[in-house]
UniProtKB/Swiss-Prot annotation:
This is N-acetyl-S-(2-succino)cysteine lyase. Pathway: Amino-acid biosynthesis; L-cysteine biosynthesis. Fumarate binds at T106, T107, R233, T278, K283, R284, N285. GO terms for cellular component: cytosol. Belongs to the lyase 1 family. Is able to complement a B.subtilis yxeK mutant in the ability to use 2SC as a sulfur source for growth. The active site is at H154, S277. PROSITE patterns: FUMARATE_LYASES. It is an enzyme of class 4 (lyase). It comes from Dickeya dadantii (strain 3937) (Erwinia chrysanthemi (strain 3937)). Pfam families: ADSL_C, Lyase_1. Catalyzes the cleavage of N-acetyl-S-(2-succino)cysteine into fumarate and N-acetylcysteine. Is involved in a S-(2-succino)cysteine (2SC) degradation pathway that allows the bacterium to recover cysteine from 2SC and to detoxify 2SC that may be a toxic metabolite. Can also perform the reverse reaction in vitro, and has minor activity against 2SC and other small molecule thiols. SUPFAM superfamilies: L-aspartase-like.
Length: 454
């Protein structure tokens, strides 16, 4: 019976994906540990450290899918050790050749390297889905390059912008996330096969070569020196997941706000039969957006646990190590849910362009006060213009009147304005700056990196 929300049948997919849960499942953990033991045996057989026929037998007979996890778990309770029962089970599968299982390595060598194998699987999923989200953002940014909407600062209406510009900001972030993932891959996907305290003493002179051969077989990079007490690789990966999750959480929160009834500029995908409330039949709640935004906080907390694991006692200890066992699966599973959720939202959300345009007019023209100020400033000076336009702006607020009318009535400003001139200045379409051009620039840059290519 599942005891963590991640694995609940009813709501588990709110917190992770089946694909990512499979990567961090107990069975896959065991499988990757067996993979390490096989690769080690083959490397040692090739180098003459153990008999070649024993290595071949281990490779052909060690089978994680045939191991009984429940029996191994019972032995773990008795032995008070996390790996020895697995080694014993593999030994039984291999007969006499089993004497050469786990030859020279320590538990952490196998567990850490197996964890990196799992992380490689997770890494590929994260890269794939991060790229897919970036592709959707690129598509939407171009589609809405000229879609006018209100830009808001401090929660209040500020200036006109375009929805495509907002999306391009997010796209640019995602390109940087892909660049980060690309950069850290070589540093993070590194195995560790060097004995009890990392000195290769149990392997003899062939130690570094055994490590290199083993890790090459596994498709992992070889460290310059053992990293049992240097956990920065996992911490760096966690840091990048934090950045990706942070952007996803921000997107979820922003779209959540734009979906508010009073703003009504977008709506997350809606399907027949979707229920918003058990008591209010009319509700079309932003459930997917809430889910997207909500996972950032727990991911941040789990990532912090990985950062804390960088503090290691002497050459190694299990206190920090075990925290990674908890947190690495969590950050990847949470992130997988966020990425898949974001994909569904971006692919299916509705954009209410009509309401976006209507919201530009909510303040009776005040959204263009900056435009008026700078135009008047060319004649009277910026500071004087700010003072005079401020007077009209506050009067528009307090009297609930049209900004244009107050400008035309102002004893000083009216001398420099005409109704036709104000109509041009107060048209939001004429004051989006370089927003459309920046959308194209971001898309060109994204395409130029090659990171969005299939």
């Amino acid at each position: 019976m599942a005891s963590h929300l991640i694995d609940f049948l009813l709501i588990g997919n709110n917190f992770g994906t089946p694909e990512m849960r499979a990567v961090w499942s107990e069975q896959n953990r065991l499988t990757r540990q067996v993979d390490v033991e096989i690769a080690l045996a083959l490397a040692e057989g090739d180098l003459g450290v153990i008999p070649q026929d024993a290595a071949s037998t281990i490779a052909s007979h060690a089978n994680a899918s045939a191991l009984n996890i429940e029996e191994i778990a019972q032995d773990a309770v008795r032995m008070k050790h996390s790996l020895m029962p697995t080694i014993a089970a593999i030994q039984r599968q291999c007969g006499e050749a089993g004497e050469y299982i786990h030859y020279g390595v320590t538990t952490q060598d196998v567990v850490d390297t197996a964890t990196v194998l799992q992380l490689r699987q997770a890494f590929d999923i994260v890269v794939r889905d991060t790229r897919l989200v970036a592709i959707e953002l690129k598509r939407l940014a171009k589609k809405h390059q000229h879609t006018l909407m209100t830009g808001r600062t401090h929660g209040m209406q500020a200036l006109p912008t375009t929805f495509g510009f907002k999306l391009a900001v997010w796209l640019d972030e995602f390109v940087r996330h892909l660049q980060r993932l690309n950069e850290i891959r070589e540093r993070v996907l590194v195995g560790n096969i060097n004995g009890a305290i990392g000195t290769y003493a149990s392997f003899g002179e062939l130690g570094p070569e055994i490590e290199r051969h083993t890790l090459t077989r596994l498709g992992l990079n070889t460290p310059n020196i053992g990293w049992q007490s240097a956990r920065d690789r996992f911490s760096e990966y966690a840091s990048v997941t934090v950045l990706i999750s942070g952007t996803l959480g921000k997107i979820g929160n922003e779209l959540y706000n734009l979906m508010r009834t009073e703003i009504n500029e977008i709506e997350e995908p809606f399907s027949e039969g979707k229920i918003g409330s058990t008591t209010m039949p009319h509700k079309r709640n932003p459930a997917a957006l809430e889910g997207l935004a909500s996972l950032t906080a727990p991911l941040f907390k789990s990532a912090a646990l990985i950062h804390e694991s960088m503090k290691v006692e002497h050459e190694r200890d299990a206190m920090s190590w075990r925290a990674e066992w908890i947190a690495l699966p969590e950050i990847n599973i949470y992130l997988s849910a966020q990425l898949q959720n974001a994909l569904g939202i971006l692919r299916g959300m509705s954009v209410n362009e009509k309401q976006m345009r209507a919201n530009l007019d909510l303040q009776n023209g005040l959204l263009l006060s900056e435009k008026v100020m700078f135009e008047i400033g060319k004649l009277l000076g910026k500071q004087t213009a700010h003072h005079l336009v401020y007077e009209c702006s506050m009067a528009a607020f307090e009297q609930n009147r049209e900004f244009k009318a107050l400008l035309l009535e102002h004893p000083v400003l009216s001398q420099h304005l005409t109704a036709d001139t104000l109509d041009t200045w107060l048209d939001p379409a004429n004051y989006v700056g370089s927003a459309p051009q920046k959308v194209d620039e971001v898309i060109r840059y994204a395409d130029g990196t090659g990171l969005l290519a299939e």
